[in-house]
Structures are given as structure tokens and as C-alpha cells.
């Protein structure tokens, strides 16, 4: 999985046994502002994030998710991904809908 840069973030990818962990660094502050972890188990892709800014008031999680969701759709050809843990506000803001007890988002290539 690739590292990438957005207008405000450098995002470092670390491959893990069951997926990938992206560490988000704010370019200006040069500090870690969060992580997003993608796991792939039993043909199901799931995302989790951690942040000091739980509701993503600064928009860093949303900014990184935009690129990550595009990558998952175009490169891995996933059609759906689930959001687990984190804030309902963040998942809904990023196009996820509550299904059963987790958030789901369809992906289009």
C-alpha cells in the first residue's frame, strides 16, 4: 500500500498481516494526528481510525479517508467497506450508512 500526501497531510502506509495501517502526519505541525487501519478478513474490508480529535473537527480523518476510499475502490476493486468504532458523525460525513451495528459504504470504481 502506498504512502501519499494531501494538501495538509503526509500519510505513511505500513503493511500489516491482515491489511494496512496509515499514519497521518500534519504537514504544518509535523505531528501525528491520527491513524486509519484497514483490515481484510473473510472477504470483508473494514476501516478503523484513531485520532485525538474524535469528531474530526480539523478534517484530517476525512481528508485521508477520501484518498484511502478511492484507493480501495480503484486499486483493490472493493465494492463495499465497513467502518468500525469511531464517531458516527465522521462515518456519516464520509458517506457511510448504519447497517445492523456497523457503518457501511459502497465503493464505485
Describe the function of each predicted region:
Residues 87-94:
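Acidic, divalent-metal-coordinating active-site segment for phosphoryl/phosphodiester hydrolysis
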